[in-house]
């Protein structure tokens, strides 16, 4: 695997938590939009905002809008993101400690080369050289685990 592909995948890994958060927020909004139950009144019975059975009307609105399909799609996308996150994390864990630190600091935590150099206690040029090697080792770890092509495709589409 080339360094640019490994970099694309690790940047995708960095963005997975935000992507999951946005999908879960969209799911909550869809559920809130079609849930007519706003609370329980003082008599202990649920009361909705629409006439008839509140659950019935919510199910009808949900079915008519296609929101249930979108909710299922969101759930499957979140599951794919979680699987990708575990897969990439396991490949990152397979990389040597020094290289893993550089990859984590640079691509996940967003440190500058100078910041990494100061934290590690090595010259800037050495840190850049180690980064180059780290990306190659990370790419090799991804290839050894399999499924790299699919994840690279999703990572490339996510970065567009």
Where is each model-derived feature located?
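N-terminal interaction/assembly modules
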Residues: 1-91, 114, 140-160
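Short amphipathic alpha helix immediately N-terminal
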Residues: 95-111
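Hydrophobic positions on the alpha-helical face of helix-turn-helix-like DNA-binding modules
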Residues: 103, 115-118
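DNA-recognition helix of helix-turn-helix
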Residues: 120-144
